[in-house]
């Protein structure tokens, strides 16, 4: 009785396992281990033979599909039926129905192309034209203001025929230019004026550089050329902090009004 109960429970367990694996492996029942199920040892051997087929690690294909290679490379699958798959030159709204067919042709032609190099399309050794993906440039959002970063704006370099004279004219303000011209005119009136013109200009340039450096080191830089650099006193704090003299007529008016009211009440 115990053996019959054990064999019955084993047969029931095997039936459940085989029912679960019926759709997975058809050759498991046809193996030699599962032909004779009368003894317990044959039952365990059949279970061991069918157990690897029930593991979740092996793909579940009907028949012997796992032993055959795939007919199509899954990496070649391109979602050409979606409009965002490719951004080609032929993909435009005005193309209509012909644009979809051309896009599919581009997709089918570009399936066999390998990864593109970073430097762009290169000519092939056999002289053939590059594919549609090789000739396509990277999509850059230049029509947006954040698409292409704008570098620092550079001012144009001014080139003058007279080197030292025009450099000094650009470097110094108007009063320095007037002083330099006056000194040069005075030096030109002397007997050796034309001969010492170059030396005098060099000396004037050095002197003006020293004066500009001294003025720069005198105190903090004040933006007087801007309207907010140093506002007038009557405009500070929105005009509320004004002097007492400007309020004198208003105070006099109030005093006269108070005196008039007191005089009328006294009468």
Curated annotation (Swiss-Prot):
Modified residues (Phosphoserine): 168
Modification N-acetylserine occurs at: 138
Modified residues (Valine amide): 150
A GO BP entry: glucose homeostasis
Outcome following mutation: residue 236 to G: May confer susceptibility to obesity; reduces the ability to activate melanocortin receptor 4
Posttranslational mods: Specific enzymatic cleavages at paired basic residues yield the different active peptides. O-glycosylated; reducing sugar is probably N-acetylgalactosamine.
Signal sequence coordinates: 1-26
Alphabetic keyword roster: Acetylation, Amidation, Cleavage on pair of basic residues, Disulfide bond, Endorphin, Glycoprotein, Hormone, Obesity, Phosphoprotein, Secreted, Signal
GO molecular function: G protein-coupled receptor binding; hormone activity; signaling receptor binding; type 1 melanocortin receptor binding; type 3 melanocortin receptor binding; type 4 melanocortin receptor binding
Basic and acidic residues bias: start-end ranges: 121-145, 222-237
Residues the record marks as carrying a glycan: 71, 91
Glutamic acid 1-amide PTM sites in chain numbering: 134
Superkingdom assignment: Eukaryota
Disease cited in the entry: Obesity: A condition characterized by an increase of body weight beyond the limitation of skeletal and physical requirements, as the result of excessive accumulation of body fat. Obesity, early-onset, with adrenal insufficiency and red hair: An autosomal recessive disorder characterized by early-onset obesity due to severe hyperphagia, pigmentary abnormalities, mainly pale skin and red hair, and secondary hypocortisolism.
Protein name: Pro-opiomelanocortin
Organism: Homo sapiens (Human)
């Amino acid at each position: 009785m115990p053996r019959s109960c054990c064999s019955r429970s084993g047969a029931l367990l095997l039936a459940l396992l085989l029912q679960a694996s019926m759709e997975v492996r058809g050759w498991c029942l046809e193996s030699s281990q599962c032909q004779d199920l009368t003894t317990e040892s044959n039952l365990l051997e059949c279970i061991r033979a069918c157990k690897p087929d029930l593991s979740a690690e092996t793909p579940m294909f009907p028949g012997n599909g796992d032993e055959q290679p795939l007919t199509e490379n899954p990496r070649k699958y391109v979602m050409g039926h979606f409009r965002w798959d490719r951004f080609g030159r032929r993909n435009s709204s005005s193309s209509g129905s012909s644009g979809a067919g051309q896009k599919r042709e581009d997709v089918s032609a570009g399936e066999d192309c390998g990864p593109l190099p970073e430097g762009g399309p290169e000519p092939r050794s056999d002289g053939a034209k590059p594919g549609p993906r090789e000739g396509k440039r990277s999509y850059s959002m230049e029509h947006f203001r954040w698409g292409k970063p704008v570098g620092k704006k550079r001012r144009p370099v001014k080139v003058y025929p007279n080197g030292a004279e025009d450099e000094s004219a650009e470097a110094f303000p108007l009063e320095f230019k007037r002083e330099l011209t006056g000194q040069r005119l005075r030096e030109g009136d002397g007997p050796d004026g034309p001969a010492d013109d170059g030396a005098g200009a060099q000396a004037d340039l050095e002197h003006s550089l020293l004066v500009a450096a001294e003025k720069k080191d005198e105190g903090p830089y004040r933006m007087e050329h801007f309207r907010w650099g140093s506002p007038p006193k009557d405009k500070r704090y929105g005009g509320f902090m004004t002097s007492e003299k400007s309020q004198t007529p208003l105070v006099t008016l109030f005093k006269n009004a108070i005196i008039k009211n007191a005089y009328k009440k006294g009468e």
